[in-house]
Amino acid sequence: DVYKRQPLDEAMKVSVYGTNRILDCLKKNGVKATFFCTSNFAENAPEVMRRIMDEGHEVAAHGCDHWQPQASDVSRSKEILERLTGRTIEGYRQPRMFPVSDTELERMGYVYNSSLNPAFIPGRYMHLSEPRTCFMIGKLLQIPASVTPWIRFPLFWLSCHNLPMWLYQSLVNRVLKHDGYFVTYFHPWEFYPLGEHPEFKMPFIIRNHSGKGMEERLDMLIRNLKEKGYPFMTYSEFAQIKLAELNKPDEK
Protein backbone atom coordinates (compact mmCIF):
# COMPACT_ATOMS: atom_id res chain seq x y z
CA ASP A 1 0.00 0.00 0.00
CA VAL A 2 1.02 3.63 -0.37
CA TYR A 3 0.09 6.72 1.64
CA LYS A 4 -1.88 8.22 -1.22
CA ARG A 5 -3.59 6.30 -3.96
CA GLN A 6 -1.35 5.93 -7.03
CA PRO A 7 -1.59 4.09 -10.35
CA LEU A 8 -0.87 0.38 -9.84
CA ASP A 9 2.54 0.38 -11.53
CA GLU A 10 3.75 3.37 -9.48
CA ALA A 11 2.37 1.95 -6.24
CA MET A 12 4.02 -1.41 -6.89
CA LYS A 13 7.37 0.21 -7.67
CA VAL A 14 7.31 2.12 -4.38
CA SER A 15 6.12 -0.86 -2.33
CA VAL A 16 8.58 -3.33 -3.84
CA TYR A 17 11.48 -0.93 -3.28
CA GLY A 18 10.49 -0.28 0.32
CA THR A 19 9.85 -3.93 1.13
CA ASN A 20 13.31 -4.87 -0.10
CA ARG A 21 14.89 -2.15 2.05
CA ILE A 22 13.05 -3.49 5.11
CA LEU A 23 14.14 -7.03 4.28
CA ASP A 24 17.74 -5.86 3.92
CA CYS A 25 17.64 -4.31 7.39
CA LEU A 26 16.05 -7.37 8.99
CA LYS A 27 18.55 -9.69 7.32
CA LYS A 28 21.47 -7.52 8.42
CA ASN A 29 20.30 -7.70 12.03
CA GLY A 30 19.21 -11.34 11.97
CA VAL A 31 15.63 -10.78 13.09
CA LYS A 32 12.29 -12.06 11.82
CA ALA A 33 9.08 -10.08 11.30
CA THR A 34 5.52 -10.39 10.01
CA PHE A 35 4.54 -8.87 6.66
CA PHE A 36 0.85 -7.98 6.41
CA CYS A 37 0.28 -8.18 2.65
CA THR A 38 -2.71 -7.27 0.53
CA SER A 39 -3.55 -10.00 -1.96
CA ASN A 40 -3.16 -7.34 -4.66
CA PHE A 41 0.48 -6.84 -3.66
CA ALA A 42 1.12 -10.57 -3.41
CA GLU A 43 -0.24 -11.21 -6.89
CA ASN A 44 1.85 -8.43 -8.43
CA ALA A 45 5.13 -8.91 -6.55
CA PRO A 46 5.91 -12.65 -6.62
CA GLU A 47 9.68 -12.19 -6.33
CA VAL A 48 9.39 -10.10 -3.17
CA MET A 49 6.88 -12.53 -1.70
CA ARG A 50 9.30 -15.36 -2.33
CA ARG A 51 12.08 -13.41 -0.64
CA ILE A 52 9.88 -12.74 2.40
CA MET A 53 9.25 -16.46 2.81
CA ASP A 54 12.76 -17.63 1.93
CA GLU A 55 14.21 -15.36 4.63
CA GLY A 56 11.96 -16.86 7.29
CA HIS A 57 9.34 -14.16 7.81
CA GLU A 58 5.62 -14.62 8.38
CA VAL A 59 3.02 -13.59 5.80
CA ALA A 60 -0.30 -12.34 7.20
CA ALA A 61 -3.39 -10.92 5.48
CA HIS A 62 -4.06 -7.22 4.94
CA GLY A 63 -7.20 -7.37 2.82
CA CYS A 64 -7.25 -7.33 -0.97
CA ASP A 65 -6.99 -3.70 -2.08
CA HIS A 66 -5.80 -1.14 0.47
CA TRP A 67 -8.02 1.58 -0.97
CA GLN A 68 -11.19 -0.40 -1.66
CA PRO A 69 -11.80 -2.63 1.37
CA GLN A 70 -14.74 -5.03 1.13
CA ALA A 71 -16.36 -7.27 3.72
CA SER A 72 -15.38 -10.26 1.59
CA ASP A 73 -11.67 -9.37 1.90
CA VAL A 74 -11.40 -11.38 5.12
CA SER A 75 -12.02 -14.61 3.24
CA ARG A 76 -10.70 -13.67 -0.21
CA SER A 77 -7.33 -12.38 0.97
CA LYS A 78 -6.75 -15.49 3.07
CA GLU A 79 -7.64 -17.80 0.20
CA ILE A 80 -5.43 -15.93 -2.27
CA LEU A 81 -2.44 -15.66 0.06
CA GLU A 82 -2.65 -19.32 1.02
CA ARG A 83 -2.79 -20.31 -2.64
CA LEU A 84 0.19 -18.11 -3.54
CA THR A 85 2.37 -18.94 -0.53
CA GLY A 86 1.40 -22.51 0.23
CA ARG A 87 1.18 -21.50 3.90
CA THR A 88 -1.62 -21.25 6.42
CA ILE A 89 -2.38 -17.58 7.03
CA GLU A 90 -2.99 -17.03 10.74
CA GLY A 91 -3.19 -13.25 11.13
CA TYR A 92 -5.20 -10.34 9.79
CA ARG A 93 -4.84 -6.56 9.88
CA GLN A 94 -7.53 -4.37 8.34
CA PRO A 95 -6.19 -1.64 6.00
CA ARG A 96 -5.81 1.67 7.84
CA MET A 97 -6.67 -0.16 11.07
CA PHE A 98 -10.37 0.17 10.29
CA PRO A 99 -12.91 -2.03 12.13
CA VAL A 100 -13.33 -5.60 10.92
CA SER A 101 -15.68 -8.42 11.91
CA ASP A 102 -14.05 -10.60 14.55
CA THR A 103 -16.84 -13.12 14.04
CA GLU A 104 -15.90 -13.46 10.37
CA LEU A 105 -12.19 -13.65 11.18
CA GLU A 106 -12.82 -16.47 13.65
CA ARG A 107 -15.10 -18.24 11.17
CA MET A 108 -12.33 -18.15 8.55
CA GLY A 109 -9.86 -19.74 10.94
CA TYR A 110 -7.63 -16.78 11.76
CA VAL A 111 -5.69 -17.05 15.01
CA TYR A 112 -5.19 -13.34 15.68
CA ASN A 113 -6.41 -9.90 14.67
CA SER A 114 -4.04 -6.91 14.82
CA SER A 115 -6.37 -4.16 13.60
CA LEU A 116 -6.51 -2.03 16.74
CA ASN A 117 -4.44 1.02 17.60
CA PRO A 118 -5.71 1.79 21.13
CA ALA A 119 -4.62 5.42 20.96
CA PHE A 120 -6.51 8.70 21.05
CA ILE A 121 -5.82 10.53 17.80
CA PRO A 122 -8.75 12.86 16.98
CA GLY A 123 -10.17 12.10 13.56
CA ARG A 124 -8.24 8.84 13.25
CA TYR A 125 -8.17 6.52 16.26
CA MET A 126 -10.62 7.09 19.13
CA HIS A 127 -10.04 3.99 21.24
CA LEU A 128 -9.51 5.14 24.81
CA SER A 129 -11.98 2.56 26.11
CA GLU A 130 -10.29 -0.38 24.36
CA PRO A 131 -7.68 -2.56 26.11
CA ARG A 132 -4.06 -1.49 25.58
CA THR A 133 -2.67 -5.01 25.63
CA CYS A 134 -3.59 -8.43 24.23
CA PHE A 135 -7.08 -9.75 24.90
CA MET A 136 -9.52 -12.31 23.53
CA ILE A 137 -12.76 -11.89 21.59
CA GLY A 138 -14.24 -15.35 21.35
CA LYS A 139 -11.40 -17.62 20.25
CA LEU A 140 -9.59 -14.81 18.43
CA LEU A 141 -6.53 -13.17 19.98
CA GLN A 142 -6.44 -9.39 19.64
CA ILE A 143 -2.93 -7.90 19.35
CA PRO A 144 -3.19 -4.09 19.57
CA ALA A 145 -0.36 -1.82 18.46
CA SER A 146 1.65 -0.61 21.44
CA VAL A 147 0.90 2.74 23.05
CA THR A 148 2.40 4.21 26.20
CA PRO A 149 0.75 3.60 29.58
CA TRP A 150 -1.60 6.25 30.94
CA ILE A 151 -1.66 8.81 28.10
CA ARG A 152 -1.70 6.20 25.32
CA PHE A 153 0.81 7.97 23.10
CA PRO A 154 1.06 5.91 19.88
CA LEU A 155 4.44 4.39 19.05
CA PHE A 156 3.60 3.46 15.47
CA TRP A 157 5.36 4.42 12.24
CA LEU A 158 4.55 8.14 12.34
CA SER A 159 6.12 8.56 15.77
CA CYS A 160 9.31 6.87 14.60
CA HIS A 161 9.42 9.29 11.64
CA ASN A 162 9.19 12.45 13.67
CA LEU A 163 10.27 12.02 17.29
CA PRO A 164 13.96 12.31 18.18
CA MET A 165 15.21 8.72 18.21
CA TRP A 166 16.41 8.97 21.80
CA LEU A 167 12.87 9.89 22.87
CA TYR A 168 11.18 7.24 20.70
CA GLN A 169 13.51 4.54 22.03
CA SER A 170 12.97 5.73 25.60
CA LEU A 171 9.19 5.39 25.18
CA VAL A 172 9.60 1.96 23.58
CA ASN A 173 11.72 0.83 26.53
CA ARG A 174 9.09 2.13 28.94
CA VAL A 175 6.41 0.06 27.21
CA LEU A 176 8.63 -3.03 27.26
CA LYS A 177 9.20 -2.68 31.00
CA HIS A 178 5.50 -2.04 31.69
CA ASP A 179 3.85 -4.54 29.31
CA GLY A 180 6.60 -7.09 28.74
CA TYR A 181 6.45 -6.72 24.96
CA PHE A 182 6.30 -4.12 22.19
CA VAL A 183 4.25 -4.19 18.97
CA THR A 184 4.69 -1.67 16.17
CA TYR A 185 4.31 -1.46 12.40
CA PHE A 186 5.71 0.31 9.34
CA HIS A 187 4.80 0.57 5.65
CA PRO A 188 7.09 -0.13 2.68
CA TRP A 189 6.50 3.31 1.18
CA GLU A 190 8.11 4.92 4.25
CA PHE A 191 11.43 3.47 3.08
CA TYR A 192 11.12 5.07 -0.36
CA PRO A 193 12.76 8.53 -0.79
CA LEU A 194 9.49 10.46 -0.75
CA GLY A 195 11.32 13.78 -0.38
CA GLU A 196 12.66 13.36 -3.92
CA HIS A 197 9.13 13.20 -5.33
CA PRO A 198 7.24 16.49 -4.88
CA GLU A 199 4.63 15.18 -7.32
CA PHE A 200 3.40 12.85 -4.55
CA LYS A 201 2.42 15.94 -2.52
CA MET A 202 3.16 14.30 0.81
CA PRO A 203 2.94 16.41 3.98
CA PHE A 204 6.20 16.98 5.84
CA ILE A 205 5.37 14.67 8.75
CA ILE A 206 4.98 11.81 6.23
CA ARG A 207 8.08 12.40 4.12
CA ASN A 208 10.26 13.39 7.09
CA HIS A 209 13.11 10.86 7.43
CA SER A 210 11.62 8.74 4.64
CA GLY A 211 13.87 6.56 2.51
CA LYS A 212 17.40 6.24 3.85
CA GLY A 213 16.41 8.03 7.04
CA MET A 214 13.87 5.34 7.91
CA GLU A 215 16.34 2.59 7.06
CA GLU A 216 18.74 4.12 9.57
CA ARG A 217 16.03 4.56 12.20
CA LEU A 218 14.76 1.00 11.90
CA ASP A 219 18.32 -0.30 12.09
CA MET A 220 18.98 1.87 15.16
CA LEU A 221 15.80 0.67 16.87
CA ILE A 222 16.58 -3.00 16.25
CA ARG A 223 20.19 -2.70 17.40
CA ASN A 224 19.16 -0.81 20.54
CA LEU A 225 16.65 -3.50 21.52
CA LYS A 226 19.03 -6.36 20.72
CA GLU A 227 21.73 -4.75 22.85
CA LYS A 228 19.28 -4.77 25.76
CA GLY A 229 18.65 -8.48 25.21
CA TYR A 230 15.07 -8.27 23.94
CA PRO A 231 14.05 -11.12 21.59
CA PHE A 232 12.30 -10.55 18.26
CA MET A 233 9.58 -12.80 16.89
CA THR A 234 6.77 -12.96 14.35
CA TYR A 235 3.16 -12.23 15.31
CA SER A 236 2.24 -15.91 15.01
CA GLU A 237 5.06 -16.89 17.38
CA PHE A 238 3.98 -14.17 19.80
CA ALA A 239 0.34 -15.27 19.47
CA GLN A 240 1.17 -18.81 20.56
CA ILE A 241 2.86 -17.50 23.70
CA LYS A 242 0.01 -15.13 24.60
CA LEU A 243 -2.68 -17.73 23.87
CA ALA A 244 -0.96 -20.15 26.22
CA GLU A 245 -0.86 -17.45 28.91
CA LEU A 246 -4.45 -16.28 28.43
CA ASN A 247 -5.88 -19.81 28.27
CA LYS A 248 -3.92 -21.12 31.26
CA PRO A 249 -6.34 -22.59 33.82
CA ASP A 250 -6.64 -20.61 37.03
CA GLU A 251 -4.71 -22.20 39.87
CA LYS A 252 -6.86 -23.20 42.80
Where are these regions (language model features)?
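Short, small-residue-biased leader/transition segments that mark boundaries at the very start
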Residues: 1-3
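The substrate-binding groove and active-site-proximal loops of carbohydrate-active enzymes
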Residues: 7-13, 37-38, 61-68, 89-90, ...
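Alpha-helical scaffold elements lining the catalytic groove of polysaccharide deacetylases
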Residues: 65-84, 131-180
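Metal-dependent polysaccharide deacetylase catalytic core of the NodB/CE4 family, i.e.
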Residues: 23, 27-101, 107-116, 122, ...
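Short catalytic helix/loop segments, enriched in acidic residues and glycine
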Residues: 5-24
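C-terminal domain-boundary segment and adjacent tail
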Residues: 18, 27-30, 165-252
